[in-house]
């Protein structure tokens, strides 16, 4: 009997060792594959960043920010009008898109909750989040540009705002949902009106998360080109008239990069570097703001 028990114990131990060996082998294979996949993705990301930096740094100068885009096959010049135009488009898109996104997010998190209207809004919002920017551009072209019979800065603002609003809605709703219901109940117990509770408690508690969403939304629209081709188009001259086509960095980069002129191509690479650095800084700032609130 003792011999049988010893043999059984030895067999179980051997089976356990084999099972553990198989698990370790599977773990090594999975770890190796995941590391290889990560390295593959990082390689292309680093390669793109290095190519952008090495090609764009040569075109960086003070003239880039002070001079207008040059005529074809002309030395010198800069991207001042394109930078100013992009700044105006992003500014106005944020001014219009952010309040709409925040108010819609407040409705979904505080008022609508599981109502049919809230579900419809969430469904439409999910569609807009995943919609290609060129589809948004064509939509705005149809309802704005075609009706006005000319391109304009305001058409570009509307298109960019339509891309920005869904991100702000989703972020605002999610951040408000993270606020404990006990805080809401405590405010109601003190006789606080709902609007005041939202303004003084839930919004205040989630302001850093909402700011993070706004910054990410700005980063999202900063480099959009396709929709601006159908709305704001571009302008070779300095113009702040939003009723007319307005210069912007993404379309200028597209036009210059596709040209046969070396001077324009150099300016295009410099513009790409500017957009890359701006988006990188916005993402870093968003993470810092969110981390500060999380650990604070």
What do these predicted regions represent?
Residues 126-164:
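Generic hydrophobic transmembrane alpha-helix motif, especially the helices
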């Amino acid at each position: 009997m003792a011999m049988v028990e010893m043999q059984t114990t030895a067999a179980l131990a051997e089976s356990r060792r084999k099972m553990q060996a198989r698990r370790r082998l599977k773990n090594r294979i999975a770890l190796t594959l995941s590391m290889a996949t990560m390295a593959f993705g990082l390689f292309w990301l680093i390669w793109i960043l290095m190519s952008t930096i090495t090609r764009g740094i040569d075109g960086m100068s003070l003239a880039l920010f002070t001079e207008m885009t040059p005529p074809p096959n002309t030395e010198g010049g800069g991207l001042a009008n394109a930078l100013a135009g992009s700044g105006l488009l992003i500014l106005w898109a944020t001014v219009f898109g952010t309040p709409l996104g925040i108010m819609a997010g407040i409705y979904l998190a505080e008022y609508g909750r599981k109502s049919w209207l809230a579900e419809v809004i969430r469904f439409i919002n999910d569609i807009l989040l995943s919609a290609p920017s060129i589809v948004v551009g064509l939509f705005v072209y149809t309802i704005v540009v075609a009706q006005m019979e000319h391109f304009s800065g305001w058409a570009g603002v509307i298109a960019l705002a339509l891309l920005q609003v869904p991100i702000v809605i989703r972020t605002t709703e999610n951040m408000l949902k993270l606020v404990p219901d006990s805080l809401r109940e405590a405010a109601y117990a003190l006789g606080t009106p709902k609007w005041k509770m939202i303004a003084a408690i839930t919004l205040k508690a989630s302001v850093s998360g909402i700011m993070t969403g706004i910054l990410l939304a700005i980063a999202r629209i900063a480099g959009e080109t396709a929709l601006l081709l159908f709305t704001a188009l571009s302008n070779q001259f300095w113009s702040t008239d939003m009723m007319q086509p307005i210069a912007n960095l993404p379309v200028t980069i597209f036009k210059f990069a596709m040209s046969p002129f070396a001077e324009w191509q150099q300016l295009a690479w410099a513009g790409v570097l500017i957009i890359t650095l701006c988006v990188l800084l916005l993402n870093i700032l968003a993470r810092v703001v969110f981390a500060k609130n999380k650990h604070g």
